[in-house]
């Protein structure tokens, strides 16, 4: 077995959810959360959500294109190359694409002082891909 695995994002993309690229699930990563998100036709990149229940902070990185994040009602401009760290797990956040081809990487961590625990929501959404 090789010491690494590799995959192109088009190989990782969900058939049922083409805007979501389930990187963590694809590689079986259990120590942190990681996904890629493509802008949808309606401009949505990442739907509004928070992590108040699981306490997990998140880092977002705009890989390509241009996104606008809305965090606790405040709009944050995020052109390609921008990192946004949402340290307050309960803060609502969402991202929209300002241009076609926008791609955002999200990385989730466990609450401070704990390890990461996969929430399982990604497996639920992937059931239709089998």
Predicted regions and their residues:
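Residue-level recognition of conserved beta-strand positions in structured domain cores
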Residues: 36, 63-64, 71-73, 88, ...
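Histidine-centered active-site/metal-ligand motif
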Residues: 49-53, 92-93
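Structural motif
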Residues: 66-68, 92, 101
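Short, conserved beta-strand element in jelly-roll/cupin
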Residues: 52-69
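Short, surface-exposed beta-edge/turn micro-motifs
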Residues: 31, 56-59, 101-102
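Double-stranded beta-helix
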Residues: 1-3, 8, 96-130
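A short, N-terminal "cap"/entry segment at the start of jelly-roll beta-barrel domains
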Residues: 1-48, 124-130
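Short acidic-glycine-tyrosine-enriched beta hairpin
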Residues: 72-90
